[in-house]
Design a protein with these regions (language model features):
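Active-site loop segments of alpha/beta catalytic cores
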Residues: 1-235
Length: 235
């Protein structure tokens, strides 16, 4: 990595933060092995898994080593500034383009290596149905965060990751198009089948009226308060 222009530019930004702020506080999104490999190989990555599996494994090996080394170097610099981080995150935004069998064969071994290199791991899936991959994710060590979409089997996911911080990625289309009754039903289901958890309302379109945002906040507060009261009430 030494001498690589992109890495040197990144380190220069880190040093600028240190000079301006002292502690280097922040979290780098390292994407994931499959996301980064796609940026390098493009759509050919997927047919390569059938016709050129050794090429795919070589790319994944290079990406994995680079991610782990980059995280370690950044964390060493942050620790020197007084900020200690020990976790890793992977953003498997493209995982739904793989069958669960191909994920298990090609990607899981490298996701596992990233997880094993750090104290805990968080896994981001966008708003996809994560059901085909949950059994494989459950084989990763020390999963501390997991998110997925509403079409997933939420009860099964909660059982697979009982101690992880769970999040539900709620789509901006649903935020904009669903009725208040439908939103209420969704959030009630999320709380009952997946909670305690976070709900992520990402990428909200500017055309969504403020009233809808207030409705979402009110719903989350009301359901959260009720769930907390039930959890703390004497049996």
């Amino acid at each position: 990595m030494d001498g690589n222009p992109c890495w040197e530019q990144f380190l220069n930004q880190v040093e600028w933060i240190a000079r301006a702020n002292g502690p280097v506080v922040g979290f780098m999104n390292w994407q994931s092995v499959v996301n980064n490999a796609y940026r390098l190989r493009g759509e050919e990555l997927f047919p390569d898994m059938i016709s050129e599996p050794d090429r795919v494994k070589h790319i994944f090996e290079c990406v994995t080593q680079t991610m782990i080394e980059g995280m370690r170097r950044l964390y060493e610099r942050q620790k020197a500034s007084g900020v200690e981080l020990t976790h890793a995150t992977i953003s498997n935004c493209l995982v739904n383009l793989l069958s669960p069998e191909m994920y298990e064969e090609f990607v899981l071994p490298y996701d596992r290596r990233v997880a094993e290199a750090f104290s805990m791991i968080g896994v981001h899936n966008c708003a996809w149905n994560a059901d085909p991959y949950v059994p494989h994710y459950a084989r990763l060590p020390d999963v501390a965060y997991m998110d997925m979409g509403l079409e997933s089997d939420l009860e099964r996911a909660r059982a697979a990751f009982p101690t992880a911080r769970r999040a539900l990625m709620y789509t901006p289309m649903d935020v904009k198009e669903k009725t208040l009754a439908q939103l209420t039903a969704d959030l009630e289901r999320i709380a009952g089948e997946y909670g305690p958890c976070d709900v992520v309302f990402a990428d909200i379109d500017r055309g969504v009226p403020d009233q809808r945002i207030h409705e979402l906040i009110d719903l989350c507060e009301r359901i959260s308060d009720r769930s907390a009261a039930v959890a703390t009430s004497p049996t």
